[in-house]
């Protein structure tokens, strides 16, 4: 019998996000957990986007100055009985405070970054190696994430948790053959790291194809000014309406310079849509390549993009991908994520 202040797992996380909260709800149904959130100024607790969704687990919201939150976290770690301490990442001071105060044998870290996007030289590398000496277990989201912890000399246990959280899952669409591939869709923020200027330039050369861009951001007006007639902007779309856009599209495209995971790729696949991704997307290996549900092109390589675009626009090959997507079981996928955590 677990006492009120005893938990199987104590999670240390940044401001709550819906996809993490849904995962924590599922884990808490199997074993008692506590989540300590530290407020991120860029994602304050009052931001409704990150507060949506009920929390069915015990949690604490830490606010104020970083020093105040560090002191509060230190007291929590010291006075709470837990079987495992799991910190979300290694680049925040709160993760360091937690793993330094907790016994190494209880310490674990969730890795959402990949080796591709990580600095490999300099004093920060030494700091990260010190951090990983205080950790006994690393939860990763695929091979590219495991490569990162091994690069920093981690010798402990590695557990593949498959994903960073739970998407707003819908029933997987049944397979329906399509006779042509012309409609592409992008969903996300309109910011430099998403590489949308480069993507729009590609569609200038393909007036026979259509690209729908869903989202808002600092580059919105600039992108609209450079976009040809076959590129359409919708602005912000409610989450409840996104499935119809995914399912109407033939291909979801994500050309980002960097995506530590890419949860939006899961959303597209859950809506039956094959994907076309740059090689900098973290989920490409486990989720896309291994399941044969999309194609990957080398970042900013126009020739390679054109090759992969030509392949995915071939109706026979496209329908092969689409049939594979229809076989994906995201309910089972979520069960496996939870199972990875509870071991």
What residue ranges belong to the model's regions?
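Short hydrophobic beta-strand element within catalytic cores of glycosyltransferases
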Residues: 274-278
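Short alpha-helical donor nucleotide-sugar binding micro-motif in glycosyltransferases
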Residues: 236-237, 244-249
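Nucleotide-activated donor-binding/catalytic signature segment of Leloir-type glycosyltransferases, i.e.
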Residues: 221-237
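Conserved donor-binding/catalytic core segment of Leloir-type glycosyltransferases
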Residues: 176-194, 200-206, 211
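A charged, aromatic-enriched C-terminal amphipathic alpha-helix characteristic of glycosyltransferases
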Residues: 316-343
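A short, histidine- and acid-enriched strand-loop-helix "catalytic/donor-clamping" loop
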Residues: 107-123, 134-137
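Donor nucleotide-sugar binding/catalytic pocket of nucleotide-sugar-dependent glycosyltransferases
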Residues: 133-173, 178-179, 234
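Aromatic "clamp/platform" in nucleotide-sugar-dependent glycosyltransferases that forms part
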Residues: 257
């Amino acid at each position: 019998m677990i006492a009120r202040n005893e938990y199987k797992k104590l999670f240390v996380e940044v401001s709550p996000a819906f996809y993490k909260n849904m995962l924590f709800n599922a884990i808490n149904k199997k074993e008692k957990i506590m989540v300590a959130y530290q407020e991120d100024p860029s994602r304050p607790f009052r931001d409704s986007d990150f507060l949506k969704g009920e929390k069915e687990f015990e949690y604490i919201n830490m606010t104020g100055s970083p020093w105040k939150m560090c002191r509060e976290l230190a007291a929590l770690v010291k006075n709470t009985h837990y079987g495992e301490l799991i910190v979300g990442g290694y680049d925040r001071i709160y993760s360091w405070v937690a793993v330094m105060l907790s016994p190494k044998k209880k310490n674990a870290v969730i890795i959402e970054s990949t080796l591709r996007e990580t600095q490999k030289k300099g004093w920060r590398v030494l700091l990260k190696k010190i951090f990983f000496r205080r950790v006994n277990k690393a939860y990763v989201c695929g091979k590219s994430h495991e490569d990162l912890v091994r690069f920093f000399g981690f010798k402990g246990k590695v557990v593949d948790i498959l994903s960073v959280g739970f998407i707003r899952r819908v029933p997987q669409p049944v397979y329906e053959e399509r006779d042509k591939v012309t409609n592409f869709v992008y969903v996300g923020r309109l910011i430099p790291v998403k590489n949308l200027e480069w993507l729009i330039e590609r569609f200038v050369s393909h007036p026979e194809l259509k690209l729908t861009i869903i989202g808002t951001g600092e580059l919105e007006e600039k992108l609209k000014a450079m976009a040809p007639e076959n590129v359409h902007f919708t602005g912000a779309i409610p989450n409840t309406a996104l499935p119809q856009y995914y399912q109407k599209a033939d291909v979801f495209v994500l050309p980002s310079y960097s995506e530590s995971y890419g949860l939006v790729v899961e959303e597209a696949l859950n809506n039956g849509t094959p994907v076309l991704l740059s090689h900098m997307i973290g989920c490409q290996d486990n989720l896309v390549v291994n399941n044969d549900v999309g194609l990957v092109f080398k970042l900013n390589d126009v020739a390679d993009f054109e090759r992969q675009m030509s392949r995915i626009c071939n109706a026979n090959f496209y329908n092969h991908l689409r049939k594979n997507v229809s076989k994906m079981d995201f309910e089972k996928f979520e069960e496996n994520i939870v199972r990875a955590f509870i071991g």
